[in-house]
């Protein structure tokens, strides 16, 4: 199922189906699009877009925030090779009109030549999302009810997972079939660092927000496979970077949309991938914040 929006400029070559292109689909994979810096990525989460662009929640206009981020991404001095949005695309319950609005707001980045990789969160609705993008559906039915993807880059492979249980059900779960797919995919791709992207955070008593229910089962897969270097997540509407007991990097993306607690930033993260780690730069919507431009230099475990 679709997790990938191609650059608009390439659509004339696709002819209604992405199956023959660099589609990232359920159980499938794709290479990064050509760009001046293939290791440069824009990482977003929790955009929470409503059909009505004037919708405000927690004193935040989500449409305005995403527009601001998109403008900054396309103007980035080292052009990014791709965009990852790590779940909670829709405002509340994933209405069809929400996804139509999201496509419109993402269009400037796609017209700039950027592919956009999408994960789903607990505020999303799979069937409504797929209905909005009928021509993007893949014929690959290896995981027909989930959105999983392998995205290859020169220095690392992204494994994008789907933790949505049901719309408006706050916790997340991967399930047996998806974890089995991930195990096979990781074992078949040990040549580069593996980076896990999933909307829900690990259940490690980080915050008082329902987490990924099968955290323990996922960590049993990730921790012993030393080529797995990091777990990137959203959901908590917080920004943090730390390591677990095995040396696995745990990166919590800030929300593009609203905050759950005062003092946290909203914005996005610019990532520069290396063979031995990654440089993460926090890009706050409020450029006056002290942590705007904060850099975290990650070094992968060995």
Describe each region flagged by the PLM:
Residues 31-99, 191, 205:
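N-terminal active-site segment of His-dependent metallophosphoesterases
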Residues 19, 48, 90, 123-125, ...:
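Catalytic metal-binding/acid-base residues of hydrolase active sites
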Residues 9-26:
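N-terminal export leaders
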Residues 272-302:
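A short C-terminal boundary segment appended to hydrolase-like catalytic domains
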Residues 1-9:
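N-terminal secretory signal peptides
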Residues 189-206:
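Short acidic, glycine-rich surface-loop motifs adjacent to enzyme active sites
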């Amino acid at each position: 199922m679709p997790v990938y929006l191609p650059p608009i400029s390439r659509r004339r070559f696709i002819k209604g189906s992405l199956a023959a292109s660099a589609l990232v689909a359920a159980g499938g994979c794709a290479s990064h699009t050509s760009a001046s810096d293939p290791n440069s990525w824009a990482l977003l989460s929790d955009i929470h877009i409503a059909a009505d662009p004037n919708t405000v929640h927690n004193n935040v206009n989500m449409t305005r925030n995403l527009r601001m981020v998109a403008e900054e991404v396309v103007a980035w001095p080292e052009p990014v090779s791709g965009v990852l949005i790590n779940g909670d695309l829709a405002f509340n319950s994933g209405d069809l009109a929400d996804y139509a609005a999201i496509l419109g707001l993402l269009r400037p980045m796609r017209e700039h030549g950027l592919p956009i990789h999408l994960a789903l969160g607990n505020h999303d609705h799979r069937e409504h999302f797929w209905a909005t993008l009928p021509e993007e559906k893949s014929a690959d039915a290896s995981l027909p009810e989930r959105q999983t993807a392998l995205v290859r880059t020169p220095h690392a492979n992204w494994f994008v997972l789907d933790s949505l249980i049901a719309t408006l059900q706050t916790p997340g779960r991967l399930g047996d079939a998806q974890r089995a797919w991930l195990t096979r995919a990781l074992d078949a791709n040990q040549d580069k660092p593996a980076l896990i992207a999933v909307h829900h955070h690990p259940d490690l008593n980080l915050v008082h927000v329902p987490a990924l229910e099968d955290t323990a089962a996922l960590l049993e897969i990730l921790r012993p496979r030393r080529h797995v270097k990091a777990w990137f997540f959203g959901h908590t509407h917080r920004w943090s970077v730390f390591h677990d007991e095995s040396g696995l990097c745990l990166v919590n993306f800030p929300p593009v949309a609203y905050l759950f607690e005062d003092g946290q930033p909203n914005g996005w993260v610019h990532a520069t991938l290396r063979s031995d780690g990654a440089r993460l730069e926090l890009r706050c919507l409020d450029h006056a914040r002290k942590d705007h431009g904060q850099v975290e230099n990650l070094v992968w475990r060995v």
